From Swiss-Prot:
Record InterPro entries: GDSL, GDSL_lipolytic_enzyme, Lipase_GDSL_AS, SGNH_hydro_sf, SGNH_plant_lipase-like
Keyword entries, A-Z: Hydrolase, Lipid degradation, Lipid metabolism, Secreted, Signal
Leader peptide range in chain numbering: 1-32
GO CC, any one term: endoplasmic reticulum
UniProt similarity note: Belongs to the 'GDSL' lipolytic enzyme family.
GO MF annotations, alphabetized: lipase activity
UniProt xrefs under PANTHER family: GDSL ESTERASE/LIPASE EXL3, GDSL ESTERASE_LIPASE EXL3
Protein name listed in UniProt: GDSL esterase/lipase EXL3
Tissue note: Flower buds.
PROSITE patterns, per database record: LIPASE_GDSL_SER (PS01098)
Compartment(s) of residence: Secreted
Taxonomy, superkingdom: Eukaryota
């Protein structure tokens, strides 16, 4: 039998993604990314929405929660932890790739230990967004309230390791900011809660809010921030159902709004780099790689990209995806999406493998 450890391939530029993923799938053990010399990242800390929520909504009175099966069926021991996924989410996977830990707990996890604080937590809340109205519509934790929890976190870390080490952790950790999808999909288009804004002015509100949030983080001593752009939100299963017509095509207006927001977010972060000494905000283009996975699923080892694995795959998400009313597809690994809104852990792994080296090196 051929030894996969010595397996190699020669790739043309046009096929580099397929080659990379072939190596990923053939390798059974995950090796942490090799950091540049002298680059130390002690913790991963996340803010934002359901993409990096690891359980903050569990004790919040909202319908935007998932601390029940079938969520978590591929998590450790098949436990539903409040992650909007069959398994782990990007915050977990990035922490693992960086050699920090395999699970990033929610800050409000009742089982949280002091040592967990030192290597990172998530403050993110599913359903939140840059628009202050977005979290209010579904009664979840706003970015402003997430920042208040972060203030508590800083004080706790200082009490554990002292002022100097606390400053080091805050300055050198990888901070993730992932939001915008719920603003576009829910607040602006589905609920029409901002009729006074056109798409251009609304995406400006979003990008301004993102810039202001990063500036506030800077005031606490944060220097390394990876800010994720909006995904092709019009192509997620639920938005195909709601806005893609009878054929459930991608909702082009949703995608155009996402691209417009991204086109404003990136230069905003470049501007902060010039005005805030020492900060390193990195724009993460998630739109293009996820869009390519959705449009060409077979290239990445998937079969289904227009429906989720839970229930019909067309609309079930959060409380609608439950073990009483929703069955689960026979093989989660064939699906790009777990429910009608969130990717599977396998999809997240593909995205992380494609993106991590591109931005980690920028923190040197």
């Amino acid at each position: 039998m051929k030894d996969n450890s010595s397996w190699s391939c020669s790739c043309s530029w046009s096929s580099w993604k397929i080659c990379l993923l072939s190596v990923l799938f053939l390798t059974e053990t995950i090796t942490a990314v090799k950091l540049p010399p002298k680059l130390i990242i002690p913790a991963v800390i996340a803010f934002g929405d359901s993409i990096v929520d690891t359980g903050m909504n569990n004790n919040v009175k909202t319908v935007v929660k998932c601390d029940f099966l079938p969520y978590g069926i591929n998590f450790q021991s098949g436990v539903a932890t409040g992650r909007f996924c069959d398994g782990r989410v990007p915050a977990d996977l990035l922490a693992e790739e960086l050699g920090i830990k395999s699970i990033v707990p929610a800050y409000l996890d009742p089982n949280l230990k002091s040592k967990d604080l030192l290597t990172g937590v998530s403050f993110a809340s599913g359903g939140s967004g840059y628009d202050p109205i977005t979290p209010k519509l579904v009664a979840v934790i706003s970015l402003e309230d997430q920042l208040s929890y972060f203030e508590e976190y800083i004080e706790k870390v200082k009490n554990i390791v002292g002022e100097a080490r606390k400053d080091f952790i805050v300055a050198n950790s990888l901070f993730l900011l992932v939001a915008g999808s719920d603003d576009i999909a829910n607040t602006y288009y589905t609920l029409r809660a901002r009729p006074e804004y056109d798409v251009d002015s609304y995406t400006t509100l979003m990008s301004d809010s993102a810039s202001e949030f990063v500036t506030k983080l800077y005031g606490y001593g944060v220097r390394r921030v990876a800010v994720f752009g909006a995904p092709p939100i019009g192509c997620v299963p639920s938005q195909r159902t709601l806005g893609g017509g009878i054929l459930r095509d991608c909702a082009d207006n949703y995608n155009e709004a996402a691209k417009l927001f991204n086109s404003k977010l990136s230069p905003k972060l470049d501007s902060l780099r010039k005005t805030l000494p020492g900060i390193k905000p990195i724009y993460i283009n998630i739109y293009d790689p996820l869009f390519d996975i959705i449009q060409n699923p077979a290239n990445y080892g998937f079969e289904v990209s227009n429906k989720g694995c839970c229930g019909t795959g067309a609309i079930e998400v959060a409380v609608l995806c439950n073990k009483i009313t929703s069955s689960v597809c026979p093989d989660v690994s064939t699906h790009v999406f777990w429910d009608s809104y969130h990717p599977t852990e396998k999809t997240y792994k593909v995205l992380v493998s494609l993106l991590i080296n591109k931005f980690v090196n920028q923190f040197v």
